[in-house]
């Protein structure tokens, strides 16, 4: 939708114009400007205070992070603007069930910190495809998974965040969507390219604090406005729009009436929009893929100074994940109560008048609440929260995607690439991602209402389960080998992509216009499909592995659970093909005298973290000691006990939340 089609709508109705004008006051603008200045200052501080001149420094923050920035960064990387728009929108449409998606993470972060990360640390890996390459050997799995992960980042995570950020920017600022998003991406890319993972984690920590404070304040205002929690539960069930027919068309009652099970997480296994077996089992598969094998998440854990800090960071993230149900999902429901005709509209012409699309306006639930309910200054703070969540998610994706490209793809193309060349390649790939992000904006913008967001939720069900199956078996069953893992991934991908393409071709439809997609393909709920795909992938991996040659234990020490404490030296599969770039580097260091750099070259190197002249070069013995430290998973007994107790408490909190709202 271009600006020409928007202008008649904004002039014909007072509401959008009033929304734009509400934000244009000194208090709101001052808060937004101060926020962006603080974020840039934090990024610059990280740029000057951390070592970004090495791959480990730029991509893993030098493995020196403590628990609280890790926990905050895990949370901020997960909670993007897509959550504020998508979760609140789904809450407005169907109730609290999507909050169960968030609570599933409480269990999975414990699995991440106690099971998966110790294996990754002992393996001495930087990326997830690198782990599979060490575990199985060969190149095809590593390269396949790297490319698939990059595609998932570009066409799900980036597009979801830009789509939801676009909705918010249009509603609140009235800026041209392309101008606003390009400015955001430039600022985001700037401090990610210059600061590396340390800048991302520190800015994530700042943005998590802003998100929580702003959202808690909004929640207080919202519940006060509706008269408390009891009144909220009563009024939501009566939040029916005033216009429910147009012309000679009568809209079915189910399209505008709140669901009877709106305040239940566990819904009917057949008729429920989110069936309870799918939520319990299907969602667990998707959260296993996301929290335990996704580069964005695991990379933050690998930056911790020791395993206790990993576990404590996971626990902090888990406690924070309790909040989205109350701060986001229920806020969408409150928005439906307060602005029923706008948020819950069903008449196409009315919906187009309010939000520019004909199939529904639930996606504007959270932004509308912010613009209409918050006082000056606090409204600016909440806009900052939305921009913070958009930027933190994008920075996480940019940094992790460039890590995947640099470590798993570029090193295969340029086997003798120097450290400096790898750093430059990673930064250039980030610029490429930013370009794709901007090019993707019109595609995202042309998608009707929240349908693209719905697609994205289901895309993970079609592409994630085979990856989760392979990682799970790789860690817990040492008999799995490379052919089994590869064909499990390939078959799972082919089945998943077939369902995805079919659904894209037919469309998901809407309440009034159901999709024509064949029931045998699209009739299976995407969470049930995830379970089926996961089981098929596991069977394929197991059968092919049993019919092919096993991997000797000498190649598996510290790569799987049963051999995690082994002290023997591991001989990597495909050893001898790696680590071939150091000799040429050393030769050039000794043979070629270094020229004195000019002022502008030194400033450029400092800005991009390419100044590698800090301190003497490590000896072979020092490098070996450093490698040993980076693969160390020992913990202080006291802190191990403290994090273990907190882990049990977190699991108990998860069980209580599910039971109370079941």
Curated annotation (Swiss-Prot):
Q: Does the keyword Signal apply?
A: no
What's in the GO CC field? apical plasma membrane
Q: Catalyzes what? A: D-glucose(out) + 2 Na(+)(out) = D-glucose(in) + 2 Na(+)(in); D-galactose(out) + 2 Na(+)(out) = D-galactose(in) + 2 Na(+)(in)
Q: How is it modified after translation?
A: N-glycosylation is not necessary for the cotransporter function.
In chain numbering, the residues marked as site (Implicated in sodium coupling) are 43, 300
Q: Which residues cross the membrane?
A: 25-47, 67-90, 96-117, 140-169, 177-193, 203-221, 276-295, 310-331, 376-406, 423-444, 452-477, 482-504, 526-547, 643-660
Topology, Extracellular side: 1-24, 91-95, 170-176, 222-275, 332-375, 445-451, 505-525, 661-662
List residues binding D-glucose. Answer: 457
Can you name this protein?
Sodium/glucose cotransporter 1
Classification from the root reads: Eukaryota, Metazoa, Chordata, Craniata, Vertebrata
Originating gene: SLC5A1
């Amino acid at each position: 939708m271009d600006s020409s089609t928007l202008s008649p709508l904004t002039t014909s109705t007072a509401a959008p114009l009033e929304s734009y004008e509400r934000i244009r006051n000194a208090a709101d603008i001052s808060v937004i400007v101060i926020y962006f200045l603080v974020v840039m200052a934090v990024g610059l501080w990280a740029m000057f205070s951390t070592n970004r001149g090495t791959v480990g420094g730029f991509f893993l923050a030098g493995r020196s992070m403590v628990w609280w920035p890790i926990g905050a960064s895990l949370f901020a990387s997960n909670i993007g603007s897509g959550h504020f728009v998508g979760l609140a929108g789904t809450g407005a449409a169907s109730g609290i069930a999507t909050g169960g998606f968030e609570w599933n993470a409480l269990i999975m972060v414990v699995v991440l910190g106690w099971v998966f990360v110790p294996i990754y640390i002992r393996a001495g890996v930087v990326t997830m495809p690198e782990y599979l390459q060490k575990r199985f050997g060969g190149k095809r799995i590593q390269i396949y998974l790297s490319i698939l992960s990059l595609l998932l980042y570009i066409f799900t995570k980036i597009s979801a965040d830009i789509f939801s950020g676009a909705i918010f920017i249009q509603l609140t600022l009235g800026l041209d969507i392309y101008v606003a998003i390009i400015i955001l991406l430039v600022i985001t890319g700037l401090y990610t390219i210059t600061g590396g993972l340390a800048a991302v984690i520190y800015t994530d920590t700042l943005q998590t604090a802003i998100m929580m404070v702003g959202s808690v304040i909004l929640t207080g205002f919202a519940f006060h406005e509706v008269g408390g929690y009891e009144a909220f539960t009563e009024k939501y069930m009566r939040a029916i729009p005033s216009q429910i027919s147009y012309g000679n068309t009568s809209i079915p009652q189910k399209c505008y009436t709140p669901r009877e099970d709106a305040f239940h997480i566990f819904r009917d296994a057949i008729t429920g929009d989110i069936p309870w077996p799918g939520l319990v089992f299907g969602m667990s598969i998707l959260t296993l893929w996301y929290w335990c094998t996704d580069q964005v998440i695991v990379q933050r854990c690998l930056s911790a100074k020791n395993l206790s800090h990993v576990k404590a960071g996971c626990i902090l993230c888990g406690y924070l994940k309790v909040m989205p149900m109350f701060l986001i999902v229920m806020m969408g429901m409150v928005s439906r109560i307060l602005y029923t005709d706008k948020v819950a509209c069903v008449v196409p012409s009315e919906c187009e008048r309010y939000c520019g699309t004909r199939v529904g306006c639930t996606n504007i639930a959270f932004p509308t609440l912010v613009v209409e309910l918050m006082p000056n200054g606090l409204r600016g703070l909440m806009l900052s929260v939305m921009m913070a969540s958009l930027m933190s998610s994008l920075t996480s994706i940019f940094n992790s995607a460039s890590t995947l490209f640099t470590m798993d793809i570029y090193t295969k193309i340029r086997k003798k690439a120097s450290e400096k060349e790898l750093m430059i390649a990673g930064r250039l790939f980030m610029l490429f991602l930013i370009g794709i992000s901007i090019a993707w904006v019109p595609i995202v913008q042309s998608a009707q209402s929240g349908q693209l967001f719905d697609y994205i939720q289901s895309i993970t069900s079609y592409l994630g389960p085979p990856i989760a199956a392979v990682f799970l078996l790789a860690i817990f069953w040492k008999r799995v080998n490379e052919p089994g893992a590869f064909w499990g991934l390939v078959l799972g991908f082919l089945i998943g992509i077939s369902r995805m393409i079919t659904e894209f071709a037919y469309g998901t439809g809407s309440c009034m216009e159901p999709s024509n997609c064949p029931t045998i393909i699209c009739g299976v709920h995407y969470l049930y499909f995830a379970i089926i795909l996961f089981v098929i992938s596991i069977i394929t991996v197991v059968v092919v592995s049993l019919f092919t040659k096993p991997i000797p234990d000498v190649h598996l020490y510290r790569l799987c659970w049963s051999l995690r404490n082994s002290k023997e030296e591991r001989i990597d599969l495909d050893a001898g093909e790696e680590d071939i770039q150091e000799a040429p580097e050393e030769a050039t260091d000794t043979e070629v005298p270094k020229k004195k750099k000019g002022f502008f070259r030194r400033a450029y190197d400092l800005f991009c973290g390419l100044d590698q002249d800090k301190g003497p070069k490590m000896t072979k013995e020092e490098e070996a000691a450093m490698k040993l430290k980076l693969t160390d998973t020992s913990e202080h007994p006291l802190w191990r006990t403290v994090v273990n107790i907190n882990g049990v408490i977190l699991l108990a909190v998860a069980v209580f939340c599910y039971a109370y709202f079941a």
